[in-house]
């Protein structure tokens, strides 16, 4: 077994550990591995076939919006569209997603390029928030909508509770 094969097996073991620690059901470990791979890492390893998490982030963002939108729609049947939009924006914003990602240690398991690593990428809000969305995309593809929804609602509970209390009109920008 050569060095790259050993490293690949070690990496997949790390990703399995991440999944187990966070109770993420996994059929296809490679999806979760991709979700935890930043563009900077993929760009530095062009000689290998490594996919970054941007496509999964795109999908995860859509699933996140749908799940939170559905939750708010059903939870607050008398709210007008504008109120639902403001509440959803507070729950799915990058800082909220980054906080969730930090709680389940996404930064520890991210594959980052050398520059991102040196500049504090493991704790950067944009990287963590994007990775949270990518993990959601991986969970959705690897399982189904219901599993992804449970994951999202469980991790966003703090922010959804704030909405229940009427505390959601924050400007995080």
Question: What is the predicted function of each stretch?
Answer:
Residues 1-173:
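Double-stranded RNA-binding/processing signature
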